[in-house]
Amino acid sequence: VEFLDVVRRRKTTNGPFRPDPVSPEHQRLLMEVAGRAPSQLNSQPWRFVLVDDRSMIERIATISGESMTEAMSNGTFFERYKPYFRFSAAEMQESRSGMLFDKLPAALRPFTKQVFTRRGQKLMNSFRVPQTLGEENRKLVAGSPLLIGVMLDRSEYRPGELSSFYSVFSMGAAMENIWLTTVEIGMGIQFVSFPMEVPGRWAEIESLLGVPDDLELMAVYRLGYLPADQQRPAIDWSSHERKLPSQYVFRNTCATPETEWDDR
């Protein structure tokens, strides 16, 4: 696959993976490309823990599913991220950013405009939407053959200092290398983020992974091979839209948007 095709095809996998274990060769490759990422002064602050033990994956999946249910039930998730929710193609076309919820059960579609109100939250809770989403999330994580915990060396990652920015920037480059490589080898990847949304749950995952005091757990991802027929969850979204170059590129100064590329 040509490199630019890989970049353009990169995406998050919301659906299930095949149950096949990720081969040792591919695990090794993913770690190699991560280690090839740039870092300030070649500090290489990243550390990774590969999780393929079924019982541990199941336990992390339970934490993730419960976290999603709680964050959805109490409204904190919708309140925190409502600027990024879209419920029509027109909304998505106008903003060219965020997530378009284009797959919803028929019973919920009439209530999308109320999702950010108290009444909307009560309706979702009465339809047990948080429980449905939480269980879907649990099953997705539990069905993943591989999880990757991404950590930073605390001697490099020092919040409030410039070194912290360098470390996070380097970690992002390492993860992008992994992400692009999954496209090349027929795999998918998704951020397991909900345990970070609920106080105390992230610490449970740190404990499960045995993260030592000199490392900071920054993220967990689920990975696996993509099935030929990719099934979408009962409630799903897409995020293919991208801003026009003139919305994020400037020429010489930030007062002059680059307008020549929008029609390409």
Label the model's feature ranges.
Residues 1-264:
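Acidic, surface-exposed loops and disordered segments
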